[in-house]
A protein has these predicted regions:
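Alpha-helical transmembrane segments in multipass membrane proteins, preferentially the mid-helix core
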Residues: 17-26, 87-93, 118-123, 142-168, ...
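Hydrophobic transmembrane alpha-helical segments in integral membrane proteins
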Residues: 1-19
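Alpha-helical transmembrane segments of multi-pass integral membrane proteins
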Residues: 39-53, 74-91, 103-124, 139-151, ...
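A cytosolic-side transmembrane-helix exit/cap motif
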Residues: 56-61, 129, 156-160, 188-194, ...
């Protein structure tokens, strides 16, 4: 039953995010915040598919243990695409609120992203095995969490200062995604049920994408 529920949920998630992303790309002008947001959604869905598709196959066939290599490779790819996702979200923030300058913030975003990706590439992660070291799981997620925190602060301040009702909860979607993700990193190997927190974490990302999509529909409608 768990395999069926999780597989159906993952398919729904991937189809939703990719469909919304493609619609945003097709329905927006080049160089706009919504074109960037659509690209961000496609990166999210495409990256997650490398992990979720093998996971669905594993759950519905011989089990996770038998799919160590494709699952590990999928997690590896997803760890990089999620970093790219937040870099794109940073540029959505810059475009939406017409931010100029802020070179120090941009440098911080790139520095944290670079450190995160370099750490993800280290062989000590043992991605292609069934047992990745907890210490490296924590280490590679420290710059990722700091990047997320930076994006949270930026959207919270800007949405409040600009009375941006469409994006007023963007910061919260990121808080929730990390709030559900961190316990999985720390304790999923000890208690596999904690891995179920990836479902509400995924829902938080769907909320993130829908915020952008709904804003595009509303703001495009006003222009027309």
């Amino acid at each position: 039953m768990r395999a069926i529920i999780e597989t159906v949920f993952d398919i729904f998630y991937l189809v939703t995010v990719l469909t919304v992303g493609i619609r945003m790309i097709c329905g927006s002008k080049a160089g706009t915040q919504f074109r960037l947001f659509g690209l961000m959604a496609v990166v999210l869905g495409a990256g997650d598919s490398f992990h979720l598709v093998p996971r669905a196959l594993a759950l519905c066939t011989t089990g996770l243990e038998s799919y160590a290599v494709p699952l590990g490779l999928g997690k590896w790819i997803t760890s990089v695409t999620m970093t790219v996702f937040y870099v794109l979200l940073y540029y959505v923030w810059r475009k939406r609120y017409q931010i100029e300058g802020q070179k120090n913030v941009t440098a911080a975003v790139y520095a944290l992203s670079a450190v995160r990706i370099v750490l993800c590439m280290m062989p000590q992660n043992q991605w292609l095995t069934n047992h990745t070291p907890l210490a490296w799981g924590i280490l590679r997620n420290v710059p990722f969490a700091l990047l997320g925190l930076l994006i949270i602060v930026l959207f919270y301040r800007s949405a409040k200062q600009n009375n941006d009702k469409a994006f007023r909860w963007m910061w919260l979607t990121i808080v929730l995604s990390f709030g559900f993700y961190i316990p999985v990193v720390l304790w999923a190997d000890v208690n596999p049920l904690i891995g179920m927190l990836m479902i509400p974490k995924t829902c938080a990302y769907v909320w993130t994408v829908l915020i952008g999509y709904n804003a595009m529909k509303a703001e495009t409608g006003k222009q027309n």
